[in-house]
Amino acid sequence: VSIANVSHAHFINEEDVYEMIDLNKNQIVGSEIININIADIEKKIEADSTVLSSEVYFTVDDVLHINVVERTPIVRIVAKDKTFYVDANGCSIPISRSGSARVIVASGEYTAENKKVLTEVRQLVDNIRNDEVLLPMIEQIYVTPNHNFILVSKVGPARIEFGDMDNCERKFQYLKTFYRADKVREMWHMYKSVSLKYKNQIVCTKI
């Protein structure tokens, strides 16, 4: 059994795979090829929410290979009623005791059933993780009671008031301009928050 894991979170192991297919290693070893249903094994493995894809095949020397690709989480959802990961396709991945992924955390005042908020969170995360300036800076998203967003920065002003999703791309452009400005970097310690909520401007609040 081979398990490919891009995020290094290790949600599943070899024994988990055998549990998915309702077999143990001893049942497979020594079995006749004709008695092993490859398509059925793949179907059972891919039914697991942690699995993106699988490939099951026999080599010429009659050795069964099971290759599994895990889903890659991009954000950890910490809703009021539930905690789980979400991948780039919007699929939920349960929290595992086997390992945790180092991804952006989205917490706050929302429930796991609020699809609109989850979609907007994923849109924010996609913008952050695909940008070389933003990715090393933003570590958390907080959802306010009125479902606006606050970004938590690792460096500089910790609180970034993003507001709603209107003009999302433009707000991120302003934020990147802010991060890149040399004069701003020299004065980071003087500010506690940055607001992008107002049209065509950045408003900074001093400590």
Which residue stretches match the model-derived regions?
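Extracytoplasmic segments of membrane-associated envelope/inner-membrane machinery
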Residues: I66-P145
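Extracytoplasmic/luminal low-complexity segments enriched in Pro/Gly and acidic/polar residues
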Residues: F162-I207
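Extracytoplasmic
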Residues: I12, I36, T59-V63, K80-D81, ...
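Short, well-structured beta-strand/strand-turn elements
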Residues: A47-D62, V133
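Periplasmic/extracytosolic POTRA-like scaffold domains at the N-termini of outer-membrane
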Residues: N5-S49, R97-Q123, G163, Q173, ...
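Flexible glycine-/small-residue-rich
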Residues: S2-N5, I66-T72, R97, S107-Y110, ...
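Short beta-strands and strand-coil junctions in structured, solvent-facing domains, enriched
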Residues: L52-S53, V63, T72-V75, I93-P94, ...
